[in-house]
């Protein structure tokens, strides 16, 4: 939010920029709660897209989109699974390899059969 203000002493006008705080707690699998971390979200996407032809700008856009979607929920808590589902949805349309990398950690593939099954569902 951009605001024009005036100094009470000298009457000089100046501009301030304010950002709305976004307090969101993430409910983990074990029911622990921790504050939402944009950096943690971004790092998980960076890891999945490593050595892929994906610009940091695209990664930032995905993070921005997901964060905005979470803000639009107007809720103070969200399950980590719902955040992971959003990441997977974005990666699936962006880059299949990045999607599989993320899915292998997120869905906790136990063996090659789990990976093969996920690949089959992508076709």
What are these regions, as identified by a protein language model?
Residues 1-6:
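Short metal-coordination and nucleic-acid-contact micro-motifs, chiefly zinc-binding Cys/His arrays
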Residues 8-25:
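Short metal-binding segments enriched for Cys and/or His
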Residues 12, 27, 38-59, 63-64:
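Basic nucleic-acid-binding interfaces
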Residues 21, 27, 63, 113-116:
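N-terminal, polar/charged subdomain of small-to-medium soluble alpha/beta proteins
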Residues 34-35, 56-59, 73-81, 105-109:
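Conserved phosphate/pyrophosphate-binding and hydrolysis machinery centered on Walker-type P-loop NTPases
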Residues 60-73, 84-89:
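Amphipathic alpha-helical segments that form the core helices of the histone-fold
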Residues 81-82, 86-92, 98-100, 104-123:
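Long C-terminal interaction/binding lobes of large macromolecular proteins
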